[in-house]
């Protein structure tokens, strides 16, 4: 057990899918996993372990923002032996060619957070996904006929940012989605010798104002979940 996870030793599979919302973790476990059992519930940050097509897989919420997700990913890796983390979350779009409900595979993650600079002795850290996991996710998306984009995310510290001009900079640099966790998760994975990938669904468009409801975000973003789970199976074959 840890201060934030009350699961016993061995409760987690070596691969954990991590949405921000613990209720989405519950939905994934109940909808996609067989024989799923709740293994942790501290602060109602729910975690489950079951199987997907016979393969052990866990799913657990990580909360909002880099500080929260860094706590959970670090403890899963160092205390429970987790080898791979797949974030399955939502993001906002700033580019006109990126649409609501598009699936984005996060090859890298820029950030305005200083967390990785603290880790990396005040130097810039290239927060990138694991190549094999990225490749497996692309293969899974192609096999299922799911439209996807591959590219950079931006992990922001502020949800309600006053710096709206930064959206123009993000668009110029080709940022596909704005969220709050990927750069932190990639940093934690690198620091502790694990692998990570973020797969996000566009939940709202910052330019147009189009958005999905909280219920839709919790219950209908199935494409990214299927990509993540199928990529786990493909990764086992590599």
Curated annotation (Swiss-Prot):
InterPro entries tied to this protein: DeoD-type, Nucleoside_phosphorylase_CS, Nucleoside_phosphorylase_d, Nucleoside_phosphorylase_sf
Any one Gene Ontology BP term: purine nucleoside catabolic process
Keywords annotated in UniProt: Glycosyltransferase, Transferase
Keyword Transferase: yes
Record keyword Glycosyltransferase present: yes
Recorded GO CC terms: cytosol
Segment forming the signal sequence: none
Stretches that traverse the bilayer: none
Binding site for phosphate: 20, 24, 43, 87-90
Active site, UniProt feature: 204
Site (Important for catalytic activity) location in chain: 217
Residue runs in coiled coils: none
Catalysis performed (reactions): a purine D-ribonucleoside + phosphate = a purine nucleobase + alpha-D-ribose 1-phosphate; a purine 2'-deoxy-D-ribonucleoside + phosphate = a purine nucleobase + 2-deoxy-alpha-D-ribose 1-phosphate
Subunit structure: Homohexamer; trimer of homodimers.
HAMAP family: Pur_nucleosid_phosp
Described function: Catalyzes the reversible phosphorolytic breakdown of the N-glycosidic bond in the beta-(deoxy)ribonucleoside molecules, with the formation of the corresponding free purine bases and pentose-1-phosphate.
Family: Belongs to the PNP/UDP phosphorylase family.
Protein name: Purine nucleoside phosphorylase DeoD-type
Species of provenance: Mannheimia succiniciproducens (strain KCTC 0769BP / MBEL55E)
């Amino acid at each position: 057990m840890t201060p934030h996870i009350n699961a016993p030793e061995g409760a987690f599979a070596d691969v954990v899918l991590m949405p921000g919302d613990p209720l989405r973790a519950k939905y994934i476990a109940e909808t996609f996993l067989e024989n799923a059992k709740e293994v942790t519930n501290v602060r109602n940050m729910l975690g489950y372990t079951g199987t997907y097509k016979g393969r052990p897989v866990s799913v657990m919420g990580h909360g909002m923002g880099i500080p929260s997700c860094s706590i959970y990913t670090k403890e899963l890796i160092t205390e429970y032996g987790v080898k791979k983390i797949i974030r399955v979350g939502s993001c906002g779009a700033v580019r006109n060619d990126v649409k609501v409900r598009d699936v984005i595979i996060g090859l890298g993650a820029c950030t305005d957070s200083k967390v990785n600079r603290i880790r990396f002795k005040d130097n810039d850290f290239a927060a990138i996904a694991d190549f094999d996991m990225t490749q497996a996710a692309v293969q899974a998306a192609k096999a299922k006929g799911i439209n996807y984009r591959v590219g950079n995310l931006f992990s922001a510290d502020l949800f309600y940012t006053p710096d709206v001009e930064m959206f123009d900079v993000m668009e110029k640099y080709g940022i596909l989605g704005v969220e709050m966790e990927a750069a932190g998760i990639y940093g934690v994975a690198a620091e502790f010798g694990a692998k990570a990938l973020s797969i996000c669904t566009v939940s709202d468009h910052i330019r147009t104002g189009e958005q999905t409801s909280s219920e839709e975000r919790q219950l209908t973003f199935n494409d990214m979940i299927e990509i993540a789970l199928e990529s786990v199976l493909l990764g086992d074959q590599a």
